[in-house]
Amino acid sequence: AMEGGIDDVGLGVLFGLELYRYEFAGILMHAEHLEAVHGVGPHTISVPRIRRADDIDPSTFSNGIDDDTFAKICALIRIAVPYTGMIISTRESQKVREKVIGLGVSQISGASRTSVGGYTEEIRPHDTEQFDVSDNRTLDEVVLWLMKMGYIPSFCTACYREGRTGDRFMALCKSKQIQNCCH
């Protein structure tokens, strides 16, 4: 993607499909490679785990990871790639999300719908969902929850709108000057 001119990329792996140590090492090596070759690491790293869906039973996969191992992965990604945004979805329960936010997860979703047309007004059938959502709270409930934990939720997309992507974003982020761009 970067060789084709895309200057801002995110990485991710669906944990549970393969041995997690292999996937974890691979994502860190990929981040390191992007830095070495392009001078820019990943803007984000997403850490979803395989979850139940209409035709998927996670117990049939022998590489699932428990909550404690998942939390360690999140903490180690934060240490290894401190400048990246780390994303966790509503695949995870409120309890797990609360734990990993404290370990460095910086972006979470709220009130997510995973089915085709899921955000339309009408009720959609559950058998079209990509995966079962574990945290079913409304967006307002998620925002209030974050505030009660002492966080300031933000929906900011200014960096993208202002062209602060790729090497421009990375320079601000690594020097910790990005905070001076946020008001």
Task: Enumerate the language-model features and the residues they cover.
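Residues at the starts of beta-strands that form the adenosine-phosphate
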Residues: 7-8, 85
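Hydrophobic beta-strand scaffold residues
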Residues: 8-9, 153
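Conserved non-cysteine loop/helix-boundary elements of the Radical SAM core domain that shape
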Residues: 1-7, 14-40, 50, 57-68
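Auxiliary Fe-S-binding modules of radical SAM enzymes
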Residues: 36-183
